[in-house]
């Protein structure tokens, strides 16, 4: 358990990129939607 410290599962290779690739456009999309709704009012 302690020897497998480096080979658990690659968090910083696939899951980190996937989370950021999905989170950044959704935050930008929600921000643009809220800005458009505030501008229309």
UniProtKB/Swiss-Prot annotation:
Pfam families in alphabetical order: Cytochrom_B559
Location (main, coarse): plastid
One annotated Gene Ontology cellular component of this protein: chloroplast thylakoid membrane
InterPro entries: PSII_cyt_b559_bsu, PSII_cyt_b559_CS, PSII_cyt_b559_N
Membrane topology label: Single-pass membrane protein
Domain of life: Eukaryota
Disulfide bonds: none
Coiled-coil ranges per UniProt: none
PROSITE patterns the record matches: CYTOCHROME_B559
Cofactor(s) needed: heme b
Binding site for heme: 20
UniProt keyword list: Chloroplast, Electron transport, Heme, Iron, Membrane, Metal-binding, Photosynthesis, Photosystem II, Plastid, Thylakoid, Transmembrane, Transmembrane helix, Transport
Keyword Plastid: yes
GO biological process: photosynthetic electron transport chain
UniProt family annotation: Belongs to the PsbE/PsbF family.
Subunit structure: Heterodimer of an alpha subunit and a beta subunit. PSII is composed of 1 copy each of membrane proteins PsbA, PsbB, PsbC, PsbD, PsbE, PsbF, PsbH, PsbI, PsbJ, PsbK, PsbL, PsbM, PsbT, PsbY, PsbZ, Psb30/Ycf12, at least 3 peripheral proteins of the oxygen-evolving complex and a large number of cofactors. It forms dimeric complexes.
Task of the protein: This b-type cytochrome is tightly associated with the reaction center of photosystem II (PSII). PSII is a light-driven water:plastoquinone oxidoreductase that uses light energy to abstract electrons from H(2)O, generating O(2) and a proton gradient subsequently used for ATP formation. It consists of a core antenna complex that captures photons, and an electron transfer chain that converts photonic excitation into a charge separation.
Protein name per the record: Cytochrome b559 subunit beta
Species assigned in the record: Euglena gracilis
